[in-house]
């Protein structure tokens, strides 16, 4: 099945890419979630125009991503308060949503929770941690934050 991606899909492509996938994957996952549209001649021509506009925007976005990277790497005071037992063990774990909220409180910048590369179960105790934030293709910022007991 030939599809045109409308969203960034891991291990498949970026918006505007024309990909060949198995019919079930396309019909049951990509199309219902709006990650892709069926590739037709008209859609392919439309995508070419969109890609040209995206390339122009990408140059501006790259400069912006570099600025944000510098800002995030120099950011201090990112603190996440969590409930803990008397032994210091957390109830649950810190999620990407918690990190996004903490960054927003620290400097007012909103991040996409999907851009934070946090493996499930990584942060389960108090302490200082670091995560990678994918800002742009090839630009990854390292963000440090502290998890404290509330």
Swiss-Prot record:
InterPro entries cross-referenced by the UniProt entry: Ribosomal_bL9, Ribosomal_bL9/RNase_H1_N, Ribosomal_bL9_bac/chp, Ribosomal_bL9_C, Ribosomal_bL9_C_sf, Ribosomal_bL9_N, Ribosomal_bL9_N_sf
Domain of life: Bacteria
Keywords: Ribonucleoprotein, Ribosomal protein, RNA-binding, rRNA-binding
Single GO MF annotation: rRNA binding
Bridged cysteine pairs (disulfide): none
Gene Ontology BP annotations: translation
Pfam families given in the database record: Ribosomal_L9_C, Ribosomal_L9_N
Gene Ontology cellular component list: ribonucleoprotein complex; ribosome
Family that this chain belongs to: Belongs to the bacterial ribosomal protein bL9 family.
Annotated function: Binds to the 23S rRNA.
Name of the protein in question: Large ribosomal subunit protein bL9
Source organism: Corynebacterium jeikeium (strain K411)
Lineage of the organism: Bacteria, Bacillati, Actinomycetota, Actinomycetes, Mycobacteriales
